[in-house]
Amino acid sequence: MQFLLLIYENEERFASGFDPAEMQEYQTFGQQHASEIKGGNALQPTTEAQTVRVRNGKALTTDGPFAETKEQLGGFYLVEAPDKAAAAAKIPGARFGCVEVRPIMTFS
C-alpha cells in the first residue's frame, strides 16, 4: 500500500541553514529505504508559498500557506509500506515535529 508522509517541522530551525548531521541522517534514511521510497523532497519555506482558490471562474492568489501554525509542511515522502505505523516509523523529522501519514487513494 502507498502512503504520503507529510513532514511538519518548525521552519525557524532551518533559518541559519541545515545541520550537517541531520542532513546525513536523512541521506542514510533514503539509502536504507530506497526500495520503499517512491518519491519525496524538501519544500521551500512558507515565505515562498502561495494559496490559490478559484471562485466564480477566477483564480484568487494570496501569499503564504493557508494556516498559521508553529509547524510548517517542510517535506514529503511517497512510500510503499504494509501499514501506517511502518510507513512513518523511521522518518528522522518525527523527532523534531510530526509526520502525517495519508494513505494514497486508488481508483479502479
Predicted feature residues:
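Conserved, structured core segments of small domains
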Residues: 1-108
